[in-house]
Amino acid sequence: MKKNITKTIIASTVIAAGLLTQTNDAKAFFSYEWKGLEIAKNLADQAKKDDERIDKLMKESDKNLTPYKAETVNDLYLIVKKLSQGDVKKAVVRIKDGGPRDYYTFDLTRPLEENRKNIKVVKNGEIDSITWY
């Protein structure tokens, strides 16, 4: 009788440990998936805001018949990305009256690096020309 009780206790301990491990794995997996969904939602929201901002900047310039203007390198990148056609991989943007640092090079196959996003564009930010590669 004592052996049966011991076997039952050991078996129930093993089963409980297995269930506990499975629930922890399930919680970890669910948490991981949830964070992934939150990140994807945040990226989609940010892309939508950026797109609306660039549309507004481009419509203003088209309405006033002035060259496109960008305040930051991120704005410049988004304008170039929106204007790109076909399988363009690189773009070089020249800024009007920018001096020796009047051009910006973008690789359109990858997103813009975080450390370049908030850099101010030289002079008034008017685009003089865009060369596609």
UniProtKB/Swiss-Prot annotation:
Keyword Secreted set for record: yes
Keyword vocabulary terms for this entry: Secreted, Signal, Virulence
Task performed by this protein: May be involved in countering the first line of host defense mechanisms. Impairs the leukocyte response to FPRL1 agonists by binding directly to host FPRL1.
Localization terms from the record: Secreted
Cellular component GO terms held in the UniProt record: extracellular region
Signal peptide: 1-28
Name recorded for this polypeptide: FPRL1 inhibitory protein
Main location: secreted
Recorded family membership: Belongs to the CHIPS/FLIPr family.
Transmembrane feature ranges: none
Pfam families according to UniProt: FPRL1_inhibitor (PF16104)
Keyword check for Secreted: yes
